[in-house]
Structure formats: C-alpha cells, structure tokens
A protein has these predicted regions:
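Amphipathic beta-strand/beta-sheet edge segments enriched in Tyr/Trp
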Residues: 104-122, 208-225
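Active-site glycine-rich loop that binds ribose-phosphate moieties when present
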Residues: 127-140, 158-161
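Beta-strand-turn-beta hairpins that frame and shape the catalytic cleft
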Residues: 2-11, 141-150, 173
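CN hydrolase (nitrilase-like) catalytic-core segments centered on the catalytic cysteine
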Residues: 70-91, 154-233
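C-terminal beta-strand edge segments of enzyme domains
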Residues: 141-143, 192-193, 202-278
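Cys-nucleophile CN-hydrolase/nitrilase-fold catalytic domain and related Cys-dependent amidase chemistry
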Residues: 22, 27-113, 164, 183-191, ...
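Short polar catalytic/cofactor-binding loops
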Residues: 14-20
Length: 278
C-alpha cells in the first residue's frame, strides 16, 4: 500500500483593493474570508492588500503611508485577523504595509489556525516604487500542521534563487502574495519555478489566482473582474526530492553567492565583429 494522501485545501483571494482604502479593503477580505474559510486550510491575500499597494501612488508621501501602515503588535486589523484565524481554525497569509522601527516593510504575515503569529516575511527584492520599503534580509520557512511552507512576495519570483532557497530549506509549498505582472509570461515563470523545485506555487494576485504543481503544470486557475476566492485541494505527497533535485551539483554553484568568486571577477571582452565583412 502507498502512503496516505497529505491533502491541503488552499483559498486564494482574487480581488482588486483600492489604494489607501484600508476600511474598504478590509471589508472585502472579511466578506470573502467569512464565505470561504470553512472550506480551506490556508487563506491567502494579494500583496499589501490592506492598503491597496499604495506605495505606487503618485501622491505618495511618508506621512500618508504612515497612516496606513500597521504595527503587528498594536493594529486592530491584525488582531482581528488573528481572531478570525482562531475562530475558523484557518491559517492566514495576510498582505499589508508594516511600520517597524522607523521603516516601512512590504509584509506577508502568517497566522496559525490557533490565532498565533507563526512568522512573517519581508519582501527582499525591491524595484521601482518598492524602494520606499526597507528590504527584507531573510528567506524563512515555517512548519505548520500539514507541512513546511515558505513565502515570497511578487517580484521576488523573478530571481530563481529565492524559491530554490525555500525548497532547499524543506518548503513544500511557496505561498506568494502578489500585485504586479500577471499575464501569460508570468504563468510560464510560475510553472518553471514549480518544475525546477518540484513544489507547489500559489500565486495570489488581484486579477488571477494560480496554483502550479511539481510537474510544472497549471493545477488550478481563477481569473475574473470581481472579488472571488480560488479554492483548491493539493496533495503534498506529490512533492519529492527525486529527479533533477536529487542530481544537483551544488559544488559547482558557488559563483551564485560569492561576490568575490574568481569567475565573477574575470574580465571578458566580447569578440569584435567586422561589419564591413557582411
């Protein structure tokens, strides 16, 4: 007999938040969570959902941003997320702007089904308006009752090393709140990240919710213009270390992390092309 399935039901909020509208965005979250929390083990929001990813606004100021940033210890919204998680026995990944020690962070907070904060992730790769945030300095993984998960946020997915680190730390699922690019190229990226790491990736965006599986296939997808939740069950027994992960050659990859590696310092001059020869 084979191993019993390790089933996990994931709920992914697909809804477009309004910038600066914390009250209205919370109402969307609460309505959809109330509707679907009894169906899922984990519920995920898009990136910075609470403030509507206001960091990109042209009228952005630090003073305005401070008005929507949340302190994890003091925020009434965060406290309510914890209460909802405990009441429904649901793990929650909640995206918001965090104010911490004089800095702003693009944060994904992981709340356990007991209502306790399991941990949080600060976006590590910042581009464009995101430079108004401070950078995260870690790629943590978290143990939950069903298995081990990791989180990245939006643009972090552009760097393959980010999700590879999570997988090498034992993560079976990458939970990914996002707000930016979501077209077909992104679908290829997510399929590739899943395939090369033999894991599930849960891409949660205002316009689309997408789950890709260890074979690099689209496992589930929901795309529409109205608030909704993708609910889908995955079997974590499909996550293995066989195949290409087992055949890695890490002794050859030092150049990826070593800024002083000789191969990175070697000067390279591309060959000159004689345009007159054509």
């Amino acid at each position: 007999m084979g191993d019993a399935p390790r089933k996990l039901t994931i709920g992914m909020l697909k809804a477009m938040p309004r910038k600066w509208d914390v009250f209205g965005n919370w109402a969307i979250f609460e309505e959809q969570f109330d509707r679907h929390s009894n169906e899922v083990d984990v519920f995920i929001t898009p990136e910075c959902f609470l403030d509507g990813y206001a960091v990109t606004e042209k009228d952005w100021t630090a003073k305005l941003f401070d008005g929507v940033a949340q302190d994890v210890q003091e925020s009434g919204y965060i406290q309510r997320v914890r209460e909802l998680a405990k009441e429904t026995q649901t793990h929650v990944v909640f995206g918001f702007t965090e104010g911490l020690e004089g800095h702003f962070y693009n944060t994904a907070l992981l709340v356990g089904k007991d209502g306790k904060v399991v941990g949080k992730y600060h976006k590590t790769h910042l581009q464009h308006s995101d430079h108004r945030f401070a950078r995260g300095e870690d790629l943590p993984v978290f143990d939950l009752d069903f298995g081990r998960v990791g989180m990245v946020i939006c643009a972090d997915r552009r760097w393959p090393e980010s999700i590879r680190v999570l997988r090498l730390k034992g993560a079976e699922v990458c939970l990914m709140p996002t707000y930016g690019m979501w077209h077909v190229n992104n679908e290829w990226w997510m399929r590739t990240r899943s395939y090369e790491n033999q894991m599930f990736v849960c891409f949660t965006h205002p316009n689309v919710a997408l789950i890709t599986n260890p074979k690099g296939e689209v496992e589930a997808k929901l795309q529409s213009n109205v608030p909704d939740v993708l609910v889908h069950e995955v079997d974590l027994l499909r996550v293995t270390n066989d195949n290409h992960l087992a055949n890695r050659r890490p002794e050859l990859y030092g150049v990826l992390a070593d800024e002083e590696h000789p191969s990175r310092q070697a000067a390279y001059e591309p060959p000159q092309v004689d345009s007159s020869a054509s």
